[in-house]
């Protein structure tokens, strides 16, 4: 039996929050030196378990603050779980924040080489791919422009183009495609489908429930850090829609 591309077992993630009531920086410093500051845990995710098979698309839906982005960062190996186990097999290309992994002071060309290298590709290979990556993103004329001059849509196109061009085993997409226009969203969906046909796994966060129904094999509904429902996308989306009226 083939091991799943992603395996999460009873994973929880907590952030540590200070309960200091210091009114000034000096008071806070004194409390820190005297170890008078107490902390509490804020659980962003609690007891999450899931699997994603090779070539499967898992959609994650839920209200703002449900823990969706935290889950994506945990799967992308950005945030380790506080408790439980997370295993992601193979190469991972995360698109979890607009512009993440890019330097705004560097040009698109320089960022493509750097980003691809971070994802495991050789620099020389990425240099050979820069023109094609920029062309797919409709950024041919802007390849030598620093990213600080890019719009959010241009950043999204560049990020998706370079991430998918590296042919990852797992693609993690957290709503960043929503900033693109309809043509780009359709183009991105087609490329994702091609990747899936070739065996890549995708975890997708989206508030566009029509997209979820169109491309997802399974869906989970997150609410307050808990998996409220998992299963067929139609069932999960219907239950979520009923809950929000």
Where are these regions (language model features)?
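H-loop/switch region of ABC-family ATPase nucleotide-binding domains
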Residues: 206-207
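Pre-NBD coupling/linker segments of ABC/ABC-like ATPases
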Residues: 2-44, 233-245
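Conserved ABC ATPase "signature" region
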Residues: 26-34, 113, 125-142, 161
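A short, surface-exposed alpha-helical micro-motif characterized by mixed small hydrophobic
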Residues: 212-214
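The feature captures the beta-strand-to-loop junction immediately N-terminal to the Walker
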Residues: 61-63
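Conserved ABC ATPase "signature" C-loop
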Residues: 224-225, 240
């Amino acid at each position: 039996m083939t091991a799943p591309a992603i395996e999460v077992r009873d994973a929880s993630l907590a952030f540590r929050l200070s309960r200091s009531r210091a009114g000034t920086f000096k008071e806070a410093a004194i409390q820190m030196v005297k170890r008078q500051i107490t902390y509490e845990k804020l659980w962003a995710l609690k007891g999450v378990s899931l699997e994603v098979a090779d070539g499967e698309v898992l959609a994650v839906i839920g209200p703002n603050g449900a823990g969706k982005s935290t889950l994506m960062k945990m799967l992308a190996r950005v945030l380790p779980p506080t408790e439980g186990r997370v295993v992601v097999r193979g190469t991972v290309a995360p698109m979890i924040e607009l512009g993440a992994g890019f330097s705004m002071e560097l040009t698109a060309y320089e960022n493509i080489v750097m980003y691809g290298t971070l994802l495991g590709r050789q620099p020389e290979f990425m240099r050979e791919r820069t023109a094609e990556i920029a062309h797919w993103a409709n950024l041919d004329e802007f390849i030598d422009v620093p990213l600080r001059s890019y719009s959010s849509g241009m950043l999204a196109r560049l990020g998706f183009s370079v991430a998918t061009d590296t042919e990852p085993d797992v693609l993690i997409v957290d709503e960043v495609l929503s900033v693109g226009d309809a043509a780009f969203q359709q183009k991105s969906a087609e490329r994702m489908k091609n990747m899936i046909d070739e065996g890549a796994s995708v975890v997708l966060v989206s508030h566009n429930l029509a997209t979820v129904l169109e491309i997802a094999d399974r869906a989970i509904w997150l609410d307050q850090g808990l998996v409220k429902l998992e299963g067929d996308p139609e069932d999960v989306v219907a239950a979520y829609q009923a809950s929000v009226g």
